């Protein structure tokens, strides 16, 4: 006998709102942060409607298998035989072959922002055309396609029918997701200092240059005294047997960072178990599983490239390390979600060693949105267990970035003054005319 799926209060509200909207309309979506249990809502709908056939579209097979494994823990004995899974890539191939995939009562698009992609979108359209009478349901944490002109797929695909929406800041303040401690530092401080020194050397005004040189020397000294990556990790990561995920930009960098593991993490624990997973590695899934299963006293570190960004949940992760620079809010939140949904340390750690927080406008506005959300929720007489001040940002690069901005403005002003001088000289040569 299978277990009945029971939803947390916030998911029950989302589920009820979704059913209400589907009672009136053919399409509806739910927007909730990663880690709040979107798949459980899907499973609940499938369980409550055994006479209906569901087709779930998602990004990869591993995601579905991972979610089904989690479902087995939540609802032992429940095997949803009326649910079929298909990747967006497979849907695209059926469209190319002209193969009809029909007979479904409900089509569910997980991470539905992907439906706006040119090739995957054609596959989704092909599926929906073959199931014209089906209800269409979508789930996503990030409905906006930031890299695609800011397209809102909730509007495009669901006609703006958002049944329920919760932002990350609300999930934090309500205690649905743990609020992380966010540490910003440089992993290449000497290189960054070298670039800054070169910029200062380009200043023509000697007095201005000397002023910046003095500031630079104070900054260099403070960065040296504060230490680098090793010191930052040792200061904040106190759990010796922690599980850590390191997001790397490419395979070459992954190898480099793996070689640095003792330098970076050695002050936390001398015994380090290192694992890696990359999209092109046939053994990556084995390493990933070994990382998840490792319950030893060692510090466990998983290095990854183009993996674990989306829809994959790892229990017990205590920290993530960002060394993959990105301008994409979607990628930023996907990586952040790996530690928020982990169920590990109550105060998970985020080590941002490439200033993603300061490089992405959406991320930089998190503190302000926390304040706005807190004001809105308390105005609705909601009792909140956390306040905006619980989101702690330790920024070891702030002074550096402020000085860099100041120098950049000075160089810009210098360039403007050079242009004015040039124009004045041209005017003199032409009898006062340009």
Predicted regions, residues:
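Walker A/P-loop
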Residues: 24-45
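SF2 helicase catalytic motif II
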Residues: 99-144
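Interdomain helical connector at the RecA1-RecA2 junction of SF1/SF2 helicase-like NTPases
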Residues: 2, 148-242, 382
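Conserved RecA-like helicase motor core of SF1/SF2 enzymes
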Residues: 300, 306-345
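Conserved segment of the helicase C-terminal RecA-like domain
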Residues: 338-367
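Long, largely alpha-helical accessory region at the distal end of helicase-like NTP-driven motors
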Residues: 214-235, 243, 359-434
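Inter-Walker segment of RecA-like/P-loop motor cores
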Residues: 61-103
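Conserved helicase ATPase core of P-loop NTP-dependent helicases/translocases
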Residues: 245, 256, 268-308
